[in-house]
Every structure is written in C-alpha cells, then in structure tokens.
Amino acid sequence: WAILSLIIQVGALFILDRVIFKQSSAFESKKIELDKPYEDKINIKIPKDADEIKISYNGKYMSYSKGDKLNMIETKSGKDKSIETENKGEVMYYEWLYERDMIVILEKVNKKGKDKIQLVTYNPKNSATTLVTEICDFKSGMKIKNVTESVFTSVYYVYVSNNEGYDRCYRIDINNDKFDVPLKGAGMENMKVIPHKDRLIYDDVVNSSIYATSPNTKLKFNTNNKLRLIGIDRNDVIYIGEVSGDKISGIVYGKIDESTSKWNSIKLDSPANSSDIFFNSKSEIMVNNILEEKIKNITTGKEYP
C-alpha cells in the first residue's frame, strides 16, 4: 500500500502541476480516450524488505535501497537494475534531483586503505556514474543528515554528523570546489538551498529558529509557535511551518529579499504532516489528504479527488 500511495501521490501531483495548473488565461475542455488502461503501463515489483523507496521527478524510474545497496526500476518495463558503487562501496544517502532524471548518491568507499565519503551522480539513461567530489574522511558513526542541491546553480550542500560531536556542512559549487559552511543553532533538522540565489535556509528545531546563509542571519517571525522549514519551490518562495504537536497547522511563506513581516500566512483546515505538503509551479500550496483520498489547493480552496 505504501508503494501504491507513493505512485498515486507523485502521479496526481505531476498531472495537477503540469496539466491543470498550466499558466493560461484560456481553458478548453476535451474528451480524452485511452486505448489502454494506464495501469497496464506500470509493472513494478519491489522486495518486501526494501527501504528508502523513492520515485524520479517524472515517474519514469523508481528506486530503493536494500542493505547498503541501491536498486533502480524502470516503471514502464519493470526492469530492476543494481547501481554499482566504486570499490563495492556503501550507499549512505541518495535522492533524485529535482526536475532531472538523475540520482545524487553519497557513498562510503575505500581508497588506498582509507574510508572516504564521496558525492557522485548517476544517470539512469546510460548507467554512467560521475564523481563530483570527495566530502571527507569517514569516521565511526558518521551519517549523512541532509543533502540539498540546486539544478539551476549546480550547487550542493551536504550535512555530515556522528555521535561524537562531528557536525559539518559542506558546500560544493559548480566547479566541484568544496567549502565549509558555518551554521548557527544547536539542532539543524531541515535545510534547503534557494534555487536561484545559492543561499541556504535551515531550521534549528531545538530553539525553533530559522536561519539563512550568505550572510548568516536569523529570520524573525511574528509568532509564538514553533517553526519548521517545510521547503522552497522553484520560484524561490520559502515555506515555514507553524508546528502544533508534531504536525503543521499553519504556513508562513515569502521570498528572502522581502521583509518577513510582509510574508503571507495561511492556516490549514486541519494539521498535516510536513511530508504531505507540496507546492506547484505557481507557488500554490497543496495538501495531500491520504485518508480522504484527495488533494486540496489551500491557496485557491479547490479540491481534486
């Protein structure tokens, strides 16, 4: 059911964003007949013990991890392929690039007797793996806590931590040069790069604060609620969630160049998980209600079954 739900969510949101929400002043209704049911074009079998199941931006591919290995499936043919790592290295983290059929992978590999963490990209069209850069030497207990990137500026941010106080955020630029990024706060949980600005937005869940880099600044909001970064859309609009319990009850949103006092705010009909909140290409906020099997555009009030 989890896999089916994922397909439905991504597919529905893709259709809503690319078809229903196309920017146009005219609307034309047409009858569409399908020669074959859409379900006939999907043939997916994922092992029951698979983890980290993810889907590519346009739905052509699905991926999952099993142990420290990564597999990819073509959703149309059902072909399952193992993604090979350098020197049989361990996949520590992966995600699909936004608006690209390409995977970003952080892997632990042994080079000349030393364990390293390196960043690579994988192209499913030709099975090509490209080294971006080595991140750091691997130390016991290290985990990749967060990764964010911009396909518009070709910049990556990688946050690495372990249980011994090692916490580092690295910025990798278009030339694959790597820099340390100093962060404020004591409990970074979520971080996203502004697509066209190369500024990192991140939250500190311990102190319920939101920060921006370049320069490193705390964003101030007129609320007593706990705050959490939900995401940033392709138009550089930042979405901050007001937290009630462990769910989002309201959203404050705007651009980094604007005073936060002028940002918009909206209340949700009922608290939602941050993972069920999305944004379309027009910077409208969508909430996926799995129980009621519908998606609501809370910016316009429209609902889509």
Each model region followed by its residue ranges:
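Extracytoplasmic/luminal low-complexity segments enriched in Pro/Gly and acidic/polar residues
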Residues: 191-305
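Short, exposed beta-strand/loop patches in secreted or surface proteins that constitute
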Residues: 52-55, 63, 93-96, 145-149, ...
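Sequence/structural signature of beta-propeller modules
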Residues: 1-50
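A short beta-strand motif characteristic of beta-propeller blades
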Residues: 38-45, 79-86, 128-139, 177-183, ...
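Non-cytosolic head/periplasmic domains of membrane-anchored proteins
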Residues: 71, 76-203, 211
